[in-house]
């Protein structure tokens, strides 16, 4: 590295006290689980995995992942039941709160001593050929990083994760579509250090392949970036990365290398001033429409794909009606409210719409058209009329469209919420009552460059 990152690392790297607290709790939990398994005669072993096990977690963001692995001969129902029982038992012994979740199969999350701890049952495998479920790879991932990442490179991983986080490109969940932690670690292995990753990213193009172990399977994937999993030749670690986030990371890398400011390791400053946001909108000369509804009782991994599907359908219908959309996005507090926002280039249309009929030369069709319509003229060779629009404003059109949601391609649970109730408003009419988080989202929506340059 050519830049001094010591001051940045002081803010993002766990200090001695934090490291000790996290590791002591992790070790105690693993010991508790293994003790419970022995007491109950369960053939299973707990092991610490993830960023805590690899020493690559950002300060204040230690999510402890403990996998409970069972022999391959264990029936799946028994694995689920015994794994959950051990997780619940451990959480109870530590006086924590439990929440059951679901990935490829159920697991339990505990909130213990201020930390979020996942207890995940899986199968004990030695290589990917023995894979029974997607989570089984995680132990192999942890082992690979532990064996290949040099101690000094852990600082580079922290810098890369924080840079990605501050530029909005970190996180493989659907809502973000960015870089997973394991992917960031592999990039450091490939390029050597933090700056090496940024310089290497400038060479990326859609379909770019990174294959650390030379598996030779990269051409079989069609994702924007292909990083062949070192422990599973048939998996692309970057499969969740969208082209948008990939391009944003390349842009942020280019900006940083040209001006390596420490501000790139801090989140952008987004406005929470409603007047400032409406002022920005006024200068742009556009209008923002806000569609709001409730939050369905589904996990966030199910919520956001449904929002994306619904919003895409809304935009398609608006465009087909003649209302031009500059940009669209969605946001939810995941408890009470869900919002879809659309910045409109054209939000109001003339009272009449020009419609074209058959060519003048079409004897049968022209006569029927002329009988049906008055005030017909010719443009080119087509009979033409003016027809009154049903909806001149995009707001009016959307209220009508959403009141008959069968006309939209919507996510199932979002559709239920819209049928229960929704509102369609101009941003100017509702921004005064908006919460801080929504205002920050709106500023980011109107100023997407803020995440990528400082």
From Swiss-Prot:
Pfam families from the UniProt entry: CAA_C, NTP_transf_2, tRNA_NucTransf2
Any one Gene Ontology BP term: RNA repair
Cofactor: Mg(2+)
InterPro entries from the UniProt entry: CAA_C, CCA-adding_arc, CCA_tRNA_nucleotrans_2, NT_2-5OAS_ClassI-CCAase, NT_sf, NuclTrfase_I-like_C, Polymerase_NTP_transf_dom, tRNA_NucTransf2
UniProt binding sites for ATP: 51, 54, 141, 161, 170
Signal peptide: none
Residues annotated to bind CTP: 51, 54, 141, 161, 170
Residues involved in Mg(2+) binding: 63, 65, 118
A GO molecular-function descriptor: ATP binding
TM stretches of this protein: none
Catalytic activity: a tRNA precursor + 2 CTP + ATP = a tRNA with a 3' CCA end + 3 diphosphate; a tRNA with a 3' CCA end + 2 CTP + ATP = a tRNA with a 3' CCACCA end + 3 diphosphate
Other facts noted in the record for this chain: A single active site specifically recognizes both ATP and CTP and is responsible for their addition.
Entries under PANTHER family matching the protein: CCA-ADDING ENZYME
Protein function: Catalyzes the addition and repair of the essential 3'-terminal CCA sequence in tRNAs without using a nucleic acid template. Adds these three nucleotides in the order of C, C, and A to the tRNA nucleotide-73, using CTP and ATP as substrates and producing inorganic pyrophosphate. tRNA 3'-terminal CCA addition is required both for tRNA processing and repair. Also involved in tRNA surveillance by mediating tandem CCA addition to generate a CCACCA at the 3' terminus of unstable tRNAs. While stable tRNAs receive only 3'-terminal CCA, unstable tRNAs are marked with CCACCA and rapidly degraded.
Recorded family membership: Belongs to the tRNA nucleotidyltransferase/poly(A) polymerase family. Archaeal CCA-adding enzyme subfamily.
Name used for this protein in its record: CCA-adding enzyme
Organism listed in the record: Methanothermobacter thermautotrophicus (strain ATCC 29096 / DSM 1053 / JCM 10044 / NBRC 100330 / Delta H)
């Amino acid at each position: 590295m050519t830049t001094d990152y010591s001051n940045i690392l002081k803010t993002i790297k766990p200090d001695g006290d934090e490291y000790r607290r996290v590791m002591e709790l992790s070790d105690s939990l693993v010991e508790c689980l293994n003790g419970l398994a022995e007491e109950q005669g369960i053939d299973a072993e707990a092991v610490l995995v993830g960023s805590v096990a690899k020493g690559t977690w950002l300060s204040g963001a230690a999510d402890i992942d403990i996998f409970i692995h069972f022999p391959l001969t264990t029936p799946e129902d028994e694995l689920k039941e015994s794994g959950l029982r051990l997780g619940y038992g451990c959480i109870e012994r530590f006086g924590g709160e439990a929440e059951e979740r679901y990935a490829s199969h159920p697991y339990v999350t505990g909130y213990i001593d201020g930390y979020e701890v996942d207890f995940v049952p899986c199968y004990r495998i030695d290589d990917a050929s023995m894979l029974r479920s997607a989570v089984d790879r995680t132990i192999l991932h942890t082992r690979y990083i532990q064996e290949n990442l040099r101690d000094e490179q852990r600082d580079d991983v922290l810098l890369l994760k924080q840079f990605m986080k501050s530029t909005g490109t970190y996180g493989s969940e659907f809502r973000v579509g960015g870089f997973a932690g394991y992917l960031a670690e592999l990039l450091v292995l490939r390029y050597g250090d933090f700056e090496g990753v940024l310089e290497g990213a400038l060479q990326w193009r859609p379909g770019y392949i990174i294959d650390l172990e030379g598996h030779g399977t990269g051409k079989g994937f069609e994702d924007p970036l292909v990083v062949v999993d070192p422990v599973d030749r048939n998996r692309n670690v970057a499969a969740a990365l969208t082209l948008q986030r990939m391009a944003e990371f390349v842009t942020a890398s280019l900006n940083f290398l040209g001006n390596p400011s420490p501000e790139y390791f801090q989140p952008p400053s987004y406005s929470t001033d409603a007047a400032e946001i409406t002022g920005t909108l006024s200068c742009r000369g556009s209008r923002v429409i806000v569609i709001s509804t409730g939050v369905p009782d589904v996990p966030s991994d199910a919520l956001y794909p449904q929002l994306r599907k619904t919003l895409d359908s809304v935009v398609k219908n608006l465009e087909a009606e003649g209302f031009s959309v500059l940009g669209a996005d969605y946001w939810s507090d995941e408890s009470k409210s869900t919002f879809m926002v659309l910045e409109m280039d054209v939000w109001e249309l003339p009272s009449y719409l020009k419609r074209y009929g058959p060519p003048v030369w079409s004897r049968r069709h022209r006569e029927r058209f002329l009988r049906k319509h008055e005030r017909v003229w010719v443009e080119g060779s087509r009979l033409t009329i003016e027809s009154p629009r049903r909806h001149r404003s995009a707001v009016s059109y959307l209220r009508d469209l959403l009141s008959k949601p069968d006309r939209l391609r919507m996510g199932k649970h979002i559709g239920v919420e819209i049928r229960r109730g929704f509102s369609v408003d101009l941003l100017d009419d509702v921004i005064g009552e908006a919460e801080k988080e929504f205002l920050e989202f709106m500023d980011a929506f109107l100023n997407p460059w803020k995440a990528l340059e400082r």
